[in-house]
Design a protein with these regions (language model features):
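Acidic, PIN/NYN-like endoribonuclease modules and their adjacent C-terminal/linker elements
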Residues: 1, 37, 41, 69, ...
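Acidic catalytic patch
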Residues: 64-96
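A general structural signal for well-ordered alpha-helical segments in protein cores
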Residues: 19, 41, 56-59, 76, ...
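Hydrophobic side chains within alpha-helical segments
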Residues: 8, 14, 46, 94-97, ...
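Acidic active-site catalytic centers that drive phospho-/nucleotidyl reactions
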Residues: 5, 91, 112
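Short, well-structured N-terminal submotif of metal-dependent ribonuclease cores
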Residues: 1-36, 48-60, 124, 132
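Phosphate- and divalent-cation-binding pockets in alpha/beta enzyme and binding domains
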Residues: 21, 43, 78, 117-118
Length: 133
């Protein structure tokens, strides 16, 4: 399984510097299940609406291809106790969402270094495709 946070999913909707590298990275792993948090739906749709209402359909199309982790009590409790304590609240929710699906294996894709460091800290592979090319 591959967990994409909002910063990664957004690059699949709006062309940014790392978008093509990320799209290729995802295509190369077409047998893997892609997932994200219900939080991403809210963050992505708000960002798409703010950028341009024309991007909302593309955002919805990408979200439809992802398995969505619900924001349930397990995820919220995991976020409340996530380490390091310096991790921002929304990033802690992403980390808890990822670990609820990927307890000891899997990959987190993000363009937030603090989240990637925290994911590595709990034993997950953490990648930022195209960021260091």
């Amino acid at each position: 399984m591959i967990y994409l946070d909002t910063s990664a999913v957004a690059k699949l909707v709006v062309e940014e510097a790392e978008s093509s590298a990320l799209a290729q990275w995802v295509d190369d792993r077409s047998d893997d299940v892609l997932c994200t948090s219900a939080l991403t739906r809210m963050e992505l749709l708000r960002a798409a609406s703010r950028r341009s209402p024309d991007t909302v359909p593309a955002a919805l199309a990408i979200l439809a291809q992802l398995a969505i982790v619900p924001l349930d009590d397990l995820v919220l409790e995991g976020a409340a106790t996530a380490s390091p304590t310096t991790l921002r609240s929304l990033d802690a929710i992403h980390l808890a969402s990822a670990t609820s699906l990927l307890p000891d294996r899997g990959t987190v894709v993000s363009y937030d270094q603090r989240l990637l460091d925290a994911a590595r800290g709990v034993g997950l592979e953490a990648v930022m495709p195209g960021a260091h090319d």
